[in-house]
């Protein structure tokens, strides 16, 4: 009989969001009259920008003609999309990238998992706590860890607590690590890192021959001009950092699927015999073997994000979500809750009232307010006692949800 990958059996429970979905379905089935407002999983609700829709239509029309038909494209992505991203999104930051250093994918979540293919299992990994569950669970799945302890920490991973005391910015590891996960603007806490804070991480990585996995999925939501949008704004980062970006929240592509990875040619690893080798070359080899490229219509739509019209239209959508964030943040603060985030990120990280556990507060909001959020403990032990709300809802639902919560907490 075929044997399973028993590393999956180490996973503590169902993935966070399916568990939330299960509880909501059970509640809705028992209470069909309840109007449940979902501010949990970070799915977008606004339609795609008109310029993006037009590009989609045009690309589909291309596929209907002999002259413009597109079959298999380059696995790394079309140059016209990569160059548009570099020109519009990186050069204004003072960041210079080669076309060969960017890879278009079908989503950042997959990239954050798949990048592990090119790193040896005996690398020591450091992740924040609380953290986007994909970072933790994918390392468990591939066999990098032992079993979890009673807190939920896995042997073999270095956890970096992100708490109120440190402003939800992790401290540098006290031990040597090889791979460091950083996410700014942060999911779930909504915090951001300054250039000075990121410089400490870049210096640590270069001094210890470590590689930073920098998740910049929410960089488009930054409103403070002093906050960096890319790790490559930091001197020395191109020697030690791999950056992930997503079109899911930036352009509403949650149902379209497109992302990108930047792997600078300068980022090096070592072979078992101690020779240096380029991670860029390894990622290219992995990509050409396991991926046939994002679809032509999707890449055409993604390119429209970087047109003048698409850029303007998309900014209006992002502003809409950030106004939602303001409404949630200020409304809950007025209700007496301690809130973080929601200024440079679409997530609000709130402290549960009265020392209530994260899941108890989830059940309270669901059953008493018919509002769905995300328990902080689902992101890691240090998230216990906190709760995440998303700004990606419809405006009228956001306003109603805040009013329900305020009324309930009086």
UniProtKB/Swiss-Prot annotation:
Keywords: Aminotransferase, Pyridoxal phosphate, Transferase. SUPFAM superfamilies: PLP-dependent transferases. Pathway: Amino-acid biosynthesis; L-lysine biosynthesis via DAP pathway; LL-2,6-diaminopimelate from (S)-tetrahydrodipicolinate (aminotransferase route): step 1/1. The modification N6-(pyridoxal phosphate)lysine is found at residue 249. Pyridoxal 5'-phosphate binds at residues 72, 108-109, 132, 187, 218, 246-248, 257, 292. This is LL-diaminopimelate aminotransferase. Its cofactor is pyridoxal 5'-phosphate. Belongs to the class-I pyridoxal-phosphate-dependent aminotransferase family. LL-diaminopimelate aminotransferase subfamily. It is an enzyme of class 2 (transferase). GO terms for biological process: lysine biosynthetic process via diaminopimelate. Homodimer. The gene is dapL.
